[in-house]
């Protein structure tokens, strides 16, 4: 299976690299290509993993891609993504994007990856250590199961990340949206 990973280069999301480090036969795109080139790469791969910062409208390109506007993954990509069943969508509110367009795969909702996001989501007093525990726990669990089908990934993330959420309010709030 050929996997395309679209992970716009951004120092605040480098922890996500852990998710795909054990995937064989992968192509990692962090920027420097156009939206049309990304579309062609999606066609050439069996599975697409998209991760970074985003919104219900898609995955932000964070200025790393050419001719793409704000989003590198948006509704223009939906017809191609619908052809795949084991996609991975990890960005804030990816669940809304997946639901609206009836896509298939593993996805996150409002995932708190920074202290500022924790404050914004009603967790004042959040410490960086809590965010780090949540972030690294999440990606290590996903990374452990990433070569399985998306139902297995989802089931194991819910169970194992749930253990972290028992003592970590950041993980608890993020878990609700997985």
Model-identified regions with their sequence ranges:
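A domain-level signal for caspase-like cysteine endopeptidase catalytic cores
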Residues: 1-51, 88-94
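Catalytic cores of nucleophile-dependent amide-cleaving enzymes
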Residues: 9, 61-136, 141
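Helix N-cap and loop-to-helix transition residues
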Residues: 34, 73-74, 149
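Polar low-complexity intrinsically disordered regions enriched in Ser/Thr and small residues
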Residues: 34-35, 55, 112, 125, ...
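A glycine-rich, hydrophobic loop/mini-helix early in the fold
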Residues: 45-65
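Intrinsically disordered, low-complexity, charge-dense segments enriched in Lys/Arg
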Residues: 124-172
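Conserved small/polar residues in nucleotide/adenosyl-binding loops
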Residues: 176-178
């Amino acid at each position: 299976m050929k996997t395309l990973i679209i992970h716009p280069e951004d120092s605040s999301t480098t922890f996500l690299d852990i998710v795909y480090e054990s995937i064989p036969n992968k192509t990692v795109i962090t920027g420097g290509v156009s939206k049309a080139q990304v579309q062609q790469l999606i066609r050439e791969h069996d599975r697409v993993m998209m991760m970074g910062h985003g919104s219900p409208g898609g995955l932000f390109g964070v200025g790393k891609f050419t001719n793409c506007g704000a989003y590198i993954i948006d509704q223009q990509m939906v017809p191609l993504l619908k052809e795949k069943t084991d996609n991975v969508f990890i960005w804030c509110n990816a669940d809304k994007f997946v639901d609206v367009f009836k896509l298939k795969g593993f996805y996150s909702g409002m995932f708190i990856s920074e202290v500022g996001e924790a404050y914004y989501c009603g967790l004042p007093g959040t410490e960086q250590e809590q965010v780090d525990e949540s972030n690294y726990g999440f990606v290590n669990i996903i990374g452990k199961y990433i070569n399985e089908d998306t139902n297995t990934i989802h089931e194991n993330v819910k169970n194992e990340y749930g253990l972290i959420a028992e003592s970590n309010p950041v993980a608890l709030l993020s878990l609700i949206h997985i």
